[in-house]
């Protein structure tokens, strides 16, 4: 039930008022392989005790594909930045140590804020088992970040205009990372057949983009901007741990 709730909150715009502040805490956990199952069970115990009620809930994903494959991502939200002023108490942290850190070799934390304007959220989609995370490697100059965000926002507007079948949420890192991988697109999906033809934008999207924005607009607004202002992107596939 808790897992279904967090997924529903992630992708349903009807629960959270549009334009309200929505933040998710992502902790990437490297498991101690000799006690990996104990880590999974420990996360479940910790989540049930501390993160199963209220507006903010937590869930665990296994990274199947990508640079963090073999690791886990603990996802906590939706939150507001003000929530970080109320840090976990000693008992809470001792439970995290006992059930999670004792079975892990490393943790890294990222705080991501939902960009409503750039996202595309159909009214109802359901709770997916899998997530595709697409993270851009933005160049380290003064204007590349904003240029890339503008492009992603334009794509979101066209997805909305054509009533695209799949949601796409856009999350920005609250705190700048060293490698500038600070914009991530999140695509939920239910089956890997989703990638039989394409692993991103809907089939025929470029044609629709040019129809709405003018001939050659997709190449200028998307292709040229991403070529000039990023060093590409990388994908990761996450699976919900039941």
Where are these regions (language model features)?
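Sec-dependent N-terminal signal peptides
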Residues: 4-14
């Amino acid at each position: 039930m808790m897992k279904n709730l967090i997924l529903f909150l992630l992708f349903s715009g009807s629960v959270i008022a549009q334009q309200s502040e929505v933040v998710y805490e992502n902790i990437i956990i490297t498991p101690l392989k000799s006690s990996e199952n104990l880590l999974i069970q420990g996360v479940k115990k910790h989540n049930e005790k501390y993160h199963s009620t209220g507006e903010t809930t937590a869930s665990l994903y296994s990274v199947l594909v990508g640079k963090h494959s073999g690791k886990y991502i603990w996802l906590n939200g939706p939150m507001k930045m003000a929530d970080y002023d109320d840090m976990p108490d000693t008992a809470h942290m001792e439970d995290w140590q006992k059930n999670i850190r004792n079975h892990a070799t490393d943790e890294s934390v990222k705080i991501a804020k939902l960009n409503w304007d750039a996202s595309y959220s159909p009214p109802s989609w359901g709770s997916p088992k899998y997530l595709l995370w697409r993270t851009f490697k933005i160049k380290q100059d003064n204007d590349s970040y904003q240029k890339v965000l503008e492009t992603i926002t334009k794509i979101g507007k066209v997805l909305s205009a054509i009533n695209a079948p799949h949601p796409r949420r856009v999350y920005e890192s609250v705190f700048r990372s060293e490698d500038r991988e600070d914009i991530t697109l999140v695509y939920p999906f239910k089956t890997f057949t989703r990638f039989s033809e394409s692993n991103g934008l809907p089939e025929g999207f470029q044609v629709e983009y040019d129809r709405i924005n003018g001939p050659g607009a997709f190449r200028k607004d998307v292709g040229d901007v991403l070529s000039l202002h990023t060093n590409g992107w990388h994908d990761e596939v996450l699976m919900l741990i039941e």
